Amino acid sequence: MYLPSDDSIFLANIVSSYHGILALEIGTSSGTILRELSKNFRVVVGTDIDFYSLKHMLMMSRNERVICCDAASALHNVKFDLIVSNPPYLPSNINHIDKSVDGGPTATEVSIHFLTSALDKLTGDGKILVLVSNLSDTCKLDRFIAKNNLVMRKIAQKDLFYETLQIIELTT
């Protein structure tokens, strides 16, 4: 389970300004973002591939719903006003793989996988918020966004001593 850190708190603060009916968090882990979403959305759903993260989340949840699945693969015939993800975004280390932080060889593979599973889950005016790091291949992510005709807007940036985090908003 990924424990909340600077990135989670950064995203939670941004998420707090969004409102709607249905919200989804892909890769909910400890539930920090999901709990923030539950303050401004009527129904919130979190997905995670790690059963133990979800078990921990359920012990602390109020009205959030969680599903153990890969990205948004188990969700059908439902559209969300907001989809949020703080995906694993660090380049993978061949000698030590940690699925809670490793985003693949270019550090964008997991982000792209999450986004691919989310695209058909948005309402017409729905939005996707995703956290990205300058440590990942942002050009590869930009190509994916362009290929899928998504509109990208940078919402916020946070400079840390070891990386720069950005939250981007995607719309169709």
Identify the role of each PLM range:
Residues 110-169:
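Conserved Class I SAM-dependent methyltransferase catalytic core
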Residues 40, 99-102, 146-147:
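Glycine-rich, phosphate-binding/catalytic loops in enzymes
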Residues 7, 49, 106, 110, ...:
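Soluble or luminal CAZymes and related metallo-dependent hydrolases
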Residues 4-76, 82-85, 91-92:
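Conserved SAM/SAH cofactor-binding pocket of Class I
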Residues 80, 95-97, 141:
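Short aromatic-enriched loop/helix-cap "lid" or pocket-rim segments at secondary-structure transitions
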Residues 89, 170-172:
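C-terminal beta-strand of the catalytic ATP-binding
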Residues 87-113:
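Mobile active-site "lid"/loop adjacent to the S-adenosyl-L-methionine
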